[in-house]
Amino acid sequence: MAEALASQLNNTTLGEASSDTRWKDQLKAPAKDARPQTEDVTATKGLEFEDFYIKRELMMGIFEAGFEKPSPIQEETIPVALTGRDILARAKNGTGKTAAFVIPTLERINPKSTKTQALILVPTRELALQTSHVCKTLGKHLGINVMVTTGGTGLMDDIIRLNDAVHILVGTPGRVLDLASKGVADLSECPTFVMDEADKLLSPEFTPVIEQLLSFHPKDRQVMLFSATFPLIVKSFKDKHMRNPYEINLMDELTLRGITQYYAFVEEKQKVHCLNTLFSKLQINQSIIFCNSTNRVELLAKKITELGYSCFYSHARMLQQHRNRVFHDFRNGVCRNLVCSDLLTRGIDIQAVNVVINFDFPKNAETYLHRIGRSGRFGHLGLAINLINWDDRFNLYKIEQELGTEIQPIPQNIDKKLYVYESPETIPRPIANASQAQLATSGNQTQNMGERRHNNHSNGGHYQFGRGRGSYRGGRSQGQRRNMQNEMNKFGTSQNQQQSGKSQPAQVSPN
């Protein structure tokens, strides 16, 4: 009898083991990313996701999303987070921080409960949308409901959605506090409280809101803070609201190793000419171009379109639905260049971006770090080019000193191996149709002077090239159109140059 029972148990175990070896083969995983990676994500302990003993349904979502092995921040965070301990984690942008807190959060969710069990706070609407997308993608086999709520959208819509079970709530602090204060979002049994980009969330403008939100959570909550930089205000919050947090610091150096940084000394009125030269010489897959004001964002987007290049723009003064559409289309490869303010400096992950250009140089090291971190995502290669005028020289030196990095003068020819991959097929692109894919991979990936793309963006954030001029197609949220003539004069492009779409290339090497 005992032998028969043992034989039956052995047969069952063998069957389960056989099943264990087959479930991965049935997954619809994306094509493997063949691009080389830097030590930012490869210097691991050799762990596998299976070593964390998480649910198979969660592992299915992880592998189907294209994850292969945990990155260093994920190796350090996930096992500790699964125990419920508070975590204070500091790691570089683009090294897998989002998945580091999303995976343990998903693992601890009970789908049978109708209560909200996790709150994830982020500082911007775009980052909220991206984070909720990660939650839904990794947790798609778990049967859980993820909701994103931000300012700028209808409050009544959020109230209606909260009538259903919401297991994970992702949002910006102000909107979540509004819902919690009205008793619509019930956080009384929400044990997980996560803050991404914690340094921004704990700035003076957000801190009172964060502390009010904590009061709606149970006292035995788990608090997890993630960021690339931790100022003194984070230490103050830790001492006040966290219990013996496990501290992770993977910031032996601040900048990503895969990003090559250059500067070019350029007079203000020559910046557009210099940008034109860069476009004609660089092999750009997608680029993000930063300006220091919303006014200059729109002006530059218009100038780029007049020069004949595809271009979207985004800034904080646009309607939220317009910003969402621009972000979605750019991420899907509809357009090659995006001009924006610092709205998109934090956490935004678009892996097809291989070039970042600071058309306006930032004033501090923190902003610079977040800007250039939009390229070189997850250990890959990227290029950061800074257009510097005479007034920026002290900020350049200060940022180099604070970050412990070297920003080199731009050479006449930039080695493509620093930011270009041998085959465009190695670049992951979430493109929905063939026409978009053709835009992404046509030719040799280089923008040419004669390239004129008519991106008829219906919701603003776009300039259409026509009749030799960029025509305005919406994108502003309020107020009358501002008189931009003074700023246009600063850019130094003549009327004839605007109509022809051509300008003389600037000398981008330093004097």
UniProtKB/Swiss-Prot annotation:
Binding site for ATP: A91, K92, N93, G94, T95, G96, K97, T98
Domain (Helicase ATP-binding): residue spans on this chain: 78-248
GO MF terms held by the record: ATP binding; ATP hydrolysis activity; RNA binding; RNA helicase activity
PROSITE patterns, per database record: DEAD_ATP_HELICASE, HELICASE_ATP_BIND_1, HELICASE_CTER, Q_MOTIF
A biological-process GO annotation: mRNA processing
Gene: dhh1
Domain Helicase C-terminal: 258-418
Name under which the protein is recorded: ATP-dependent RNA helicase dhh1
Keyword flag Transport: yes
Lineage: Eukaryota, Fungi, Dikarya, Ascomycota, Pezizomycotina
Organism: Aspergillus oryzae (strain ATCC 42149 / RIB 40)
